Amino acid sequence: LDWIVPQEWLIKDAYILDPMGKKIADFTKNNLHLVNYSCAIDKTISLTELKKHLHTLPLMPNDVPYVTSYYNRTWGFCISHNEFENLKEGKYKVFIDSNHIDGSLVYGELALPGKTKKEILITSYLCHPKMANHELGGPVALCYLYKMLKASGPHKYTYRFLICPENIGAAAFLHKSGKDVGNVIEAGFILNCLAYGNEWVLKKSREGNL
């Protein structure tokens, strides 16, 4: 694989001050307000310029969206569309105290041995902040599934569990372990968006045979 793990992102604080000096989009109160991976900035700009860096959900006007920019060095904030519509003309101070360093990518891996070396790979993501459905629901279900399978085993297959950052985490795992697990994996499942209260669904592979 020729993917490159992005630099580690360190964030301390971020906010916007409106023309009256009121703090909005305060990262310390809701970390969804900041576009993940935003570059540092400390600048006073016009409302027109600010709007180029604001993200909203017009169809869900009370909600704050989650936005990332891992491969495009920029900055931005996320606010509700209702708040966006009520912004007044004037000068806005934007402040982001962040840094990008050569750090590390961490993922969790655990194998539950079976009667054969053939494996079932079960993965979930752990990279989105503050969200129960498109984040925490998957890892929680994965942990309970491991506990259930361990208590009812041994099983025919070896079950390998992986919790990692979405996309780049899976690429890092395959880069490190792909040659070892590629020949033994019989099937794989990604547990995602399991906490939204509706019926669970199974999404097939691109070929439609899994």
Where do the language-model regions lie?
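N-terminal hydrophobic/helix-forming segments and targeting peptides
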Residues: 1-210
